[in-house]
Design a protein with these regions (language model features):
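A polyanion-binding, active-site-adjacent surface
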Residues: 1-169
Length: 169
């Protein structure tokens, strides 16, 4: 699993590692709740440099970092990519991605299964989104991921909440 965020925040910029601030702590806690350990995942950002004043990355910044992200993906060869936030999802899944409508859905692209979740910073700003994000995360574990791998087709969307309790192997 490869997790791709948007861009470094102040803490990440200081420490040179993604998701180390409050958002990183929340991400770690959420991953633990579904039995995933951060040390077994590859976590990066689509933009490698911190945009001033925490603004969304500009197209020129995204374009400047595209090659780095492509090389990371080529080296890691992830089976699953989780985009954290709108900016990452629009960069990785498709430019018109709507995080409020499409979070938690699996998409197949370039032989890789992809899903977008609300960014941890968005969850800190609006804690009411945490339960639905946790439900989205649960789809990454166990039968949900197995089901998605078996049924995803190029361009096919598997809606959130559409995972049977048991999937025969």
């Amino acid at each position: 699993i490869m997790i791709i965020g948007e861009a470094p925040g102040a803490n990440e910029d200081k420490q040179g590692e993604p998701f180390v601030g409050r958002g990183g702590k929340l991400l770690d806690d959420m991953l633990k709740m579904i039995g995933l350990d951060r040390s077994r995942l590859y976590i990066t950002n689509s933009v490698k440099c911190r945009p001033p004043e925490n603004r969304d990355p500009m197209n020129t910044e995204k374009d400047a970092c595209k090659g780095y992200l492509q090389r990371q993906r080529a080296l890691m060869q992830p089976k699953i990519i989780v985009c954290l936030g709108r900016v990452s999802a629009m960069e990785i899944i498709r430019p018109d991605f709507k995080i409020s409508q499409e979070h938690g859905q699996f998409f197949e692209k370039d032989g890789c299964l992809m899903m977008a979740l609300y960014h941890p910073a968005a969850l800190l700003r609006d804690p009411r989104k945490k339960p639905e994000t946790f439900e989205d995360l649960k789809r990454l574990q166990g039968n949900g991921t197995l089901f998605a791998h078996k049924t995803a087709r190029k361009g096919l969307v598997i809606p959130a909440g559409h995972v049977p309790a048991q999937v025969p192997v």
